Amino acid sequence: MEFENKEVVNRPLVSVIIPIYNVGTTIYRMIECLEQQTFQMFELILVNDGSTDESEEICKTIIRNHQNYYLYSKENQGAFSARNLGIEKANGAYLTFLDADDKIDSNYLEILFHNCMGTDIAVCDVAVYKEDTEISRFTGGNQKITQTQALNKLLVRKEINSGPCGKMFSQKIIEEVRFPFLRVYEDILFVLECFCKVREITVTDKTTYYYMQEDTGTMGRMAKSPSVDIIAATEKIMDFIADRRDLSEECTYITISHLYQYALPVAIQNNYRGCEFILKTQILYRKYMEQILKCKAMPWKEKVIFYLYAHGYVYTNKFIKKIQR
């Protein structure tokens, strides 16, 4: 179902895409950020992904007051599906993605737009906040970097965050790229594919995207209901790294370590009994064991931990636990 407040007469320079799912308490904050932008030649595409709260009604109210705001509603499938619909509906020469519960600087669109014009992709600082405190920041200064440099920074989770937010893409780059059908980890695969379509990327610290971290821990939620989508995504990333001889070995180390950060809590939550997530993770570690053992960036202690896990044992608190079938 579509709710539009006017026909598109003139093509906007930028399309801003926001997936909407039960964000009735935070959406106005992001709308206020957009209203305060120094750059106003944009359209806003809100995609309601089957919200069960008042989000859709709030969005209908919002678009009535803005001629360049549009709302599309669909059944719940996940952020990947909502963003893909947003891409299909976008009319801008450039696209950027926001999340409804985050914040941006008032010069966010202006800075990214001007930096994106020369290289087709622009990346800005991303500050991670918990409540009112900044707990980390991705920052790469002001520079143009090569595709290889950008991929390395993305995959080692340094300077460039893994998600689509904090970035702007030209429409010609994103035209044939879509978010994969995964509930989690779909964002880094999307960004990875976009980065592979350009020779250079512009990085700027002149504006900031503020990621507002939830109070509830992602790892805790993941341990209770693990998603095998993480395993599928990790496999794609590992294959990508193996095919690219120009990438740092740290990319392998970080990718494998990041998966283990999910696998260990799942094993503990299940009292060291095997479940689908654990068994499939073990298969992945065995599949890439040669890459793991040859990785010069990975400490030997962690290689041993991953080897043990691949063969049914978990190392935790100086004890080795056998995973029960």
How should each PLM-predicted stretch be described?
Residues 2, 271-325:
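Membrane-interface aromatic/basic loop that binds lipid-linked glycans or pyrophosphate carriers
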Residues 22-36:
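Short, well-formed alpha-helical segments that are part of the catalytic scaffolds
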Residues 33, 48-58:
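A conserved acidic beta->alpha catalytic loop
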Residues 42-50, 70-75, 100:
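Short beta-strand/loop segment that forms part of the nucleotide-sugar
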Residues 74-90:
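Glycine-rich, basic loop-to-helix element that forms the pyrophosphate-binding segment
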Residues 79-80, 100-202, 211-226, 299:
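Donor-binding/catalytic cores of nucleotide-activated saccharide
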Residues 95:
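Short aromatic/hydrophobic "clamp" motif used to bind/position activated sugar donors
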Residues 208-214, 220-247, 261-289:
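Catalytic core of nucleotide-sugar-dependent glycosyltransferases
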